[in-house]
From Swiss-Prot:
UniProt name for this protein: Large ribosomal subunit protein uL1
Gene: rpl-10a
Record-level Gene Ontology MF annotations: RNA binding; structural constituent of ribosome
Pfam families: Ribosomal_L1
Domain of life per record: Eukaryota
Source species of the chain: Caenorhabditis elegans
Transcription regulation recorded as keyword: no
Amino acid sequence: MSKVSRESLNEAIAEVLKGSSEKPRKFRETIELQIGLKNYDPQKDKRFSGSIRLKHIPRPNMKVCVFGDQHHLDEAAAGDIPSMSADDLKKLNKQKKLIKKLAKSYDAFIASESLIKQIPRILGPGLNKAGKFPSVVTHGESLQSKSDEIRATVKFQMKKVLCLSVAVGHVGLTQEELVSNISLSINFLVSLLKKNWQNVRSLNIKSTMGKPQRVY
């Protein structure tokens, strides 16, 4: 984190948390890292994309659904995790509207190893278009830990514009936990950029309803 001092990061996080505690909301505010880029041409330069798992789950309320074989359906039922069988998916009959609705209902999907190859055939390209193609889960992994892994993973993806924002925490985390998540995120982002720090115009952190605090 060469260019962002721990001190300025601590100050910015303290301001974000203070602002949030002074005006409590009815929901738990997410804290985002907002990134402005420079010396980048989205038309010509390669658009970067990468995911990193943070130490502390930034979005604990993220809704995850399991497309399961019998083993995972039983585990999902026992753990109160939303799930669908292959038959449930076949009933959607590749109808675009229904698949769009399914994609909107959840933030992410997990599929049993035995099912994952069938998903494109059963559902068509709908989930892929929504950027929500399922992650695979084996019988050796617990659904709960897989769900937590997905909730802890954030994706940095360059689109057509020179700014992006990524959830890096929430106001229920401690200052130290947020420093850890944000430092990790900034380092990872810079490693994805062609010219590293020379491509970073600005870095701000803000809570959902709060004011942005500049850290770079």
